[in-house]
Every structure is written in C-alpha cells, then in structure tokens.
C-alpha cells in the first residue's frame, strides 16, 4: 500500500513552517525555512528523502506564497493551494 506523504506549509512574510505528515500521522517536529532560494533548497532536500513525491499543501497568502508556488512549479512538485477562508471554514466545522 502506498503511503500518503504531505508537507503542510504555513507561509509567512519572511519564513515558512513545514510539518510532515505520513498517513495522517505527524512526523517529528516542524521545521522552518526562509522564503528564498536557500530555504527552498532545504525544502527540496527534505522532499527528496522520500521514494514517492510528497504533496505540498499551503494556504494562498497573496504575495508571500507566490515565490513558493513558483518554486514548486519549476521543480514539478505536486501542490495544493488552499483558499484561506475555505480552510478556516473546514477547520471550524471539524
């Protein structure tokens, strides 16, 4: 059975916090990356540790998430960009 690996990213203005979840179980402690080429390389290094490509999930935070989205697209990494209002509504209903 194939694992479901998700990298959840909380994007802020200067840095982002990354949490890894495998089959709905949080793996270790979240880590922080800078929102620049050095931070994105660190993210790529973590993504490449897995045999299957993880799905990256993040909220659309306007200008703050644009560089992350561009990086993911350039590197052909699957991602899901959430509408923040819909994400909050989903969380409030659970």
Can you annotate each of these PLM segments?
Residues 1-94:
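Phosphate- and other anionic-substrate recognition elements at nucleic-acid/protein interfaces
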């Amino acid at each position: 059975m194939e694992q479901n690996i998700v990298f959840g990213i909380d994007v802020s203005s200067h840095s982002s916090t990354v949490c890894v979840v495998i089959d709905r179980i949080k793996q270790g402690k979240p880590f922080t990356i800078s929102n620049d080429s050095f931070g994105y390389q660190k993210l790529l290094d973590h993504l490449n540790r897995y045999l299957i490509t993880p799905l990256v999930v993040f909220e659309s935070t306007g200008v703050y998430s644009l560089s992350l989205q561009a990086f993911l697209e350039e590197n052909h990494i699957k991602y899901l960009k959430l509408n923040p209002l819909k994400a909050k509504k989903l969380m409030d209903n659970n």
